[in-house]
């Protein structure tokens, strides 16, 4: 099914959210010839560990998405302050509406509506408003999802997971986080894969399917 999508949009409130939520799926889509665009809304300057320059995450997301096969011209990085998205709701909506009017993606990958991070939830809510005429899937961020009932599995193979892990390892500034762990990423994908008799999988909440 996903090989029929020609244009896919990934919404990442902060750099690396998209890679964690659907990095394997992005590689599968790229391999199938899909035009994948990645939009990050914040480089989380105020959350960087000491010693890293302010533009660190802007550079790291470019390296990470390149690992997934996404060219630099398909990456857009905004610089909204972290944890202020609810106050910037209208600005975010206008950015998303402009994307719809300019590009009209076949599918949008975004955070879950059940994500407890205020920035993630704002992007999810405004994504539903901006892209209500196309397919919308909510990706999994387990440490932020208190309620994540998923209905859509994307089966993945070893090389998809290897590229997802390689992308996440480009975030040198985030390697101190417990979830930035290759074993964790692989085992989560393996667990989802076992549930559908595949080697690996990523899972999504379905908000709208337009076929």
Question: How would you describe each model-predicted region?
Answer:
Residues 1-135, 184, 188-199:
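Active-site beta-strand->loop->alpha-helix modules in alpha/beta enzyme cores, enriched
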Residues 40-42, 79-81, 140-142, 157, ...:
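Residues at the C-termini of beta-strands that transition into short coil/loop
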Residues 72, 175-176:
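Surface-exposed helix-capping loop/turn segments at secondary-structure junctions
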Residues 82-86, 144-146, 160-161:
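A short acidic, often aromatic-flanked loop/helix-cap motif at beta-alpha or helix-coil junctions
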Residues 85, 154, 204:
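Short clusters of hydrophobic/aromatic residues that line enzyme substrate/ligand-binding pockets
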Residues 134-155:
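Short, flexible loop segments at boundaries between secondary-structure elements
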Residues 154-174, 180-190:
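A conserved mid-domain beta-alpha-beta active-site/ligand-binding segment of alpha/beta enzyme cores
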Residues 197-211:
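Short, basic/aromatic-enriched C-terminal tail that caps enzymatic domains
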């Amino acid at each position: 099914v996903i090989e029929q999508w020609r244009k896919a949009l990934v919404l990442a409130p902060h750099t690396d959210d998209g890679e964690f939520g659907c990095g394997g799926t992005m590689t599968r889509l790229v391999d199938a010839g899909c035009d994948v665009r990645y939009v990050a809304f914040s480089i989380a300057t105020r959350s960087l560990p000491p010693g890293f320059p302010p533009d660190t995450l802007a550079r790291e997301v470019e390296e990470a998405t390149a690992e997934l096969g996404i060219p630099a011209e398909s990456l857009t990085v905004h610089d909204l302050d972290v944890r202020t998205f609810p106050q910037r709701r209208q600005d975010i909506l206008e950015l998303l509406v402009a994307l719809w009017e300019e590009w009209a993606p076949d599918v949008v990958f975004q955070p879950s509506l059940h994500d407890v991070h205020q920035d993630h939830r704002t992007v999810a809510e405004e994504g539903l408003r901006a892209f209500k005429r196309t397919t919308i899937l909510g990706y999994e961020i387990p440490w932020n999802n208190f309620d994540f009932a998923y209905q859509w599995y994307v089966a993945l193979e070893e090389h998809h997971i290897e590229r997802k892990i390689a992308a996440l390892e480009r975030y040198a500034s985030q390697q101190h986080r417990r979830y930035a762990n290759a074993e964790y990423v692989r085992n989560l994908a393996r667990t989802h894969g076992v549930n559908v008799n595949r080697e690996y999988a990523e899972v999504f909440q379905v908000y709208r399917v337009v076929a």
